[in-house]
Amino acid sequence: MAAMAVGGAGGSRVSSGRDLNCVPEIADTLGAVAKQGFDFLCMPVFHPRFKREFIQEPAKNRPGPQTRSDLLLSGRDWNTLIVGKLSPWIRPDSKVEKIRRNSEAAMLQELNFGAYLGLPAFLLPLNQEDNTNLARVLTNHIHTGHHSSMFWMRVPLVAPEDLRDDIIENAPTTHTEEYSGEEKTWMWWHNFRTLCDYSKRIAVALEIGADLPSNHVIDRWLGEPIKAAILPTSIFLTNKKGFPVLSKMHQRLIFRLLKLEVQFIITGTNHHSEKEFCSYLQYLEYLSQNRPPPNAYELFAKGYEDYLQSPLQPLMDNLESQTYEVFEKDPIKYSQYQQAIYKCLLDRVPEEEKDTNVQVLMVLGAGRGPLVNASLRAAKQADRRIKLYAVEKNPNAVVTLENWQFEEWGSQVTVVSSDMREWVAPEKADIIVSELLGSFADNELSPECLDGAQHFLKDDGVSIPGEYTSFLAPISSSKLYNEVRACREKDRDPEAQFEMPYVVRLHNFHQLSAPQPCFTFSHPNRDPMIDNNRYCTLEFPVEVNTVLHGFAGYFETVLYQDITLSIRPETHSPGMFSWFPILFPIKQPITVREGQTICVRFWRCSNSKKVWYEWAVTAPVCSAIHNPTGRSYTIGL
């Protein structure tokens, strides 16, 4: 009946629903709504004014059907086109016991009937501070049924009483809630989802009013599992031609919600009576088509958003051909390497020596040869002579290198099939070039590899890269917390999945504070006793009430002088997609109050066979130390 169903957001068009409080003729209404261009209908499952009695006689045994027949629509239509709504009189957290008990029974009746119909989603209101019993009834329903419905909690972006203009300024108000103003509704949601133990089936339907809160409040909401945004017709303005439009601030919010692929629900009567109701939907389509186009990084990362991957271990494992292929497609990385090698060659070889001074350049971890090609291009660009060694431990990639040498490179390049730490070089290098960095800089063991290879670098030799630094930032993300929680493996400790890092394209998250530098490594390392173990303490000021779920890791590297690569958001190399950030989760979410400081301790540890990280939060409260002795995750040497 409709082109798209609930849960079908994606692609270029907007997925949208129409919210109605009363639907006398369901099939006719659904047809009319579909004709207007909407994909689904939000409607009460029972008549909103039909208060059932479950406790007292005689009303308890009132004869006749409780609601309309499921035969009015096909099973497929119930499954895809209808979102159920709870009757407005149901108040399971009422202080009046009779109302509470009756509401519990009515709520279960409506949820069970929704499950019987196979509804894809059910809308429930969160409109007060105490929703504890609502959470209990819903959790019990989720755990007892065999249905798969989603539950969308309808939460206002700004609490209704915050918009009252009848309150005299500075006069005391009667409400006694702990949180006021912009914080309030997020705290309702946060407490509710905590009571429901972060159930993946409970999401947010965010109701957007005419007044918007400050940016940090909006940022925080965008780290939540928002499945729908409810737009009342009353928030639309009118343009010169009489069509509904939104303010610039609202448009910016819609653009950000579109990135999260939320579905939009239009509620309320037509406030632009001379225009068709579908003009509200047409305006959303217009916004969708006119949003900023995705950049190269976003295009590359499409489909990988919030998808957890285990970090590569190229030292312990031999990479596959396709893995090399993906990294070789990066347009920025190799041009930066070429620029760094070019500058280095010009600095090391003066113009008058360009025909006699042959620089020995060693590519350590040559893979399938992209750095060898970048080096050859740099030498040609600089008009300097080089002699190249391509050192690679993966015997499969060596086949590719030998083919390159036979077909293209010739005697200028010597291919060496060996681990760089064990290779006995025939001569010392002027320049060593490597691409051994992971998302957290040193997590693919670049320090250990380059330290093991620097004995064949001349005393005045140069390493490209010369330095790299890892960065950490605290983040909040229900989505990522649930993704990590779902990674539990049968024969391992039940919390082992929280003691390992993940490479992930961060998407549905809120960064709580700016990234700070963690560990720095420099090459060549001239310390008499080389020790790559590290320990750091980082303190992050937090300016908003929130919840901590883990830490995002990034890195920056100086290839040579002013030539750099970075995945830190503030300095990210434009268009570079070789690395996604890394995520270090924590076992238990930690509530953080506005003005508090998050303190994290981070260790880099090692023994003769492996390297691992350990981490712990020590403020505002203490967590357990994660991954002690590398019990859940190590990187093999």
UniProtKB/Swiss-Prot annotation:
Subcellular location: Cytoplasm; Nucleus; Chromosome; Golgi apparatus
Tissue-level expression: Ubiquitous.
Keyword Methyltransferase listed: yes
Region TIM barrel, annotated ranges: 13-292
CDD domains found in the cross-reference section: AdoMet_MTases (cd02440)
Gene Ontology process terms (BP): chromatin remodeling; circadian regulation of gene expression; DNA-templated transcription termination; endothelial cell activation; Golgi ribbon formation; liver regeneration; negative regulation of cell differentiation; negative regulation of gene expression via chromosomal CpG island methylation
Positions of region (Dimerization): 488-494
UniProt cross-references to Gene3D superfamilies, sorted A to Z: Divalent-metal-dependent TIM barrel enzymes, Hnrnp arginine n-methyltransferase1, Vaccinia Virus protein VP39
UniProt-listed Pfam families: PRMT5 (PF05185), PRMT5_C (PF17286), PRMT5_TIM (PF17285)
Positions of modified residues (N-acetylalanine): A2
Site feature location: Critical for specifying symmetric addition of methyl groups: F327
EC identifiers of the protein: 2.1.1.320
Family: Belongs to the class I-like SAM-binding methyltransferase superfamily. Protein arginine N-methyltransferase family.
Subunit structure as annotated in this protein's UniProt entry: Forms, at least, homodimers and homotetramers. Component of the methylosome complex, composed of PRMT5, WDR77 and CLNS1A. Found in a complex composed of PRMT5, WDR77 and RIOK1. RIOK1 and CLNS1A associate with PRMT5 in a mutually exclusive fashion, which allows the recruitment of distinct methylation substrates, such as nucleolin/NCL and Sm proteins, respectively. Interacts with PRDM1. Identified in a complex composed of methylosome and PRMT1 and ERH. Interacts with EGFR; methylates EGFR and stimulates EGFR-mediated ERK activation. Interacts with HOXA9. Interacts with SRGAP2.
Role, per record: Arginine methyltransferase that can both catalyze the formation of omega-N monomethylarginine (MMA) and symmetrical dimethylarginine (sDMA), with a preference for the formation of MMA. Specifically mediates the symmetrical dimethylation of arginine residues in the small nuclear ribonucleoproteins Sm D1 (SNRPD1) and Sm D3 (SNRPD3); such methylation being required for the assembly and biogenesis of snRNP core particles. Methylates SUPT5H and may regulate its transcriptional elongation properties. May methylate the N-terminal region of MBD2.
Name of the protein described by the UniProt record: Protein arginine N-methyltransferase 5
